[in-house]
A protein has these predicted regions:
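Cytosolic regulatory regions of ion transport systems
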Residues: 1-187
Length: 187
């Protein structure tokens, strides 16, 4: 567990922290351990995601494309045409499609079959854009939405809109650092 969301508070867990009812726990694990995590949290029958759409072609999108299982189809929508060409060079996988366009354009999203997408991830450098894009995706029936929100002041507001998962690099990094410290103490 790299973070716990308890009401308005985000906790980077230590060795003594415990989950409470209504907590939202953020896990980080290797692919092979996902079934165990699902079993622990009672989501064994959770339907797998097959179609993913990412708005924004940053490093996180590239990393996601490289680590995604072959059974998943990924569409990355990027506004910058040069970046699209670079993404095509960086990602050479049959199950990944790079689309030049604006991920906020609802006609483009419909054209790219957003209604058949199980997960939508907004990774632009703009928190407001990411939040609104996830809201729009939710309204189009996307089951799982993830918005990158770097402005800490926006996190609780975004969570109150029920847009799905909020990711923040600072919180994730803090969780990694703390986990490394714990690992070093156990050696």
């Amino acid at each position: 567990i790299v973070a716990i969301k308890r009401g308005e508070e985000t906790i980077i867990p230590g060795g003594l922290d415990k989950l409470e009812l209504q907590d939202l726990a953020y896990f980080m694990t290797k692919k092979e351990y996902i079934p165990y995590i699902r079993e622990i949290v009672g989501k064994e029958d959770y339907e797998d995601v097959h179609n993913v759409m990412i708005m924004g072609g940053d490093k996180a999108a590239v990393r996601t494309a490289h680590t995604m299982p072959e059974y998943m189809n990924l569409k990355i929508i990027e506004r910058d045409e040069e970046r699209c060409h670079k993404l095509n060079e960086l990602i050479d996988k049959k199950n990944v499609m790079i689309i030049h366009g604006d991920g906020r354009d609802m006609s483009l999203l419909r054209e790219e079959n957003i209604s058949n997408t199980q997960a939508f991830v907004a990774l632009t450098g703009n928190a407001e854009t990411n939040i609104l894009a996830c809201l729009a995706a939710k309204r189009r029936g996307v089951r799982k939405t993830i918005a990158q929100v770097e402005n800490l002041d926006y996190i609780s507001m975004a969570e109150s809109l029920d847009i799905g998962t909020i990711i923040n690099k600072k919180i994730i990094a803090a969780g990694h650092i703390y986990q490394m410290l714990l690992d070093n103490e156990m050696m």
